Amino acid sequence: SDDTEAAQSVLAKIGVKIAEDEDSWRVTGDNFHQPEGGELFCRESAATLRFMTAVCSLVPGECRLTASPSLLRRPIKPLIQALQQLGVDVSHRNKSVVIKGGGLKGGTTEMPGNISSQFVSALLLISPFAEEGGKIKLTTPLESKPYVLMTLECLNTFGIKVRHSPDLREFQVSRQTYQPAKYVVEGDWSSASYLLALGALCGEIEVENLNSKSLQGDKAVLDFLKDMGASVTSGNNSIKVKKARLKAINADLTDCIDLLPTVAVLAAVAEGTSEFTGIKRARLKESDRVSAVKEGLSRMGIKVTEEMDKLVVTGSVPKGAVIDSKGDHRMAMAFALLGAVVGGTTIEGAECVSKTYPEFWDILKGIGGKVRLDGK
């Protein structure tokens, strides 16, 4: 995907060696150097920009992180301020993030937990290198907790121990050394959610390479599908979903915010009125997803109301429409599901799915979807 390539590219430019085999990568690090020209382009990848803002504090010399205009409009200030509290020379200027690295003092830092869990993960990744270790205090409750739990699990695999409070509001990391390890990358529940939802809408779909015990927050799509009445069967490393008459649900998406477009389009054909809360952070994604979902569903004849932290969808019979994806991969894929149900739907900016799921349109066609790209 574009995001994976963005991360691979910037890591290579600071000295990380990545050898690709057919189904694995061998990564050799611990020899960071200043990138030629000092610039690292993170494309549209928020995770790459946020993680590298922290990692570049360990790189000797100056690094200048740049990204697409839409990504640079998204929040980064809380992470910069948290790093400054740890002694990092970092600033946000001239449409870039500039870090003068080479050493990390460490100490105690504070930041909000309700903007992006990636800020917390970024600090956890570098804290073992800090001379004084690192203590992270969150001034607001942590949202998207599962992704921080995944970070802690990953760190543990590489020999890093982190002490934390039960509510994940405080983290303590002593100075430690990463140990080489083998790490298995799970199948992505976020990408799989579209195919699983399609099964509930159109027939029967089985998705393989999914860990039913995963920590990934978007695994919650299974619970939502079951609550809506879909037939869901867990197999050996696979999930099967069968079409069913769907009913409305009320759901808190605080810890699985990326599922909003998916569950909203399911609600559009469900019997009754669904209410989704805990969605305020969805306004800070590649698009304002709350408003974008309302706009798209309204174009398809579905009654939708929005508040800052709530979306209410009344199910009906959607009609085909022209949908503006806003350049947002999750919007494009979610509305493709309704398009598959009702036909006559055009997704503008459909190429944006390459950000995380470049094979999406080919897979949709492969399972019987009537898809035509760019008039072809």
Question: In which residue ranges do the predicted regions lie?
Answer:
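Short, structured segments at the rim of ligand-binding sites
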Residues: S1-K376
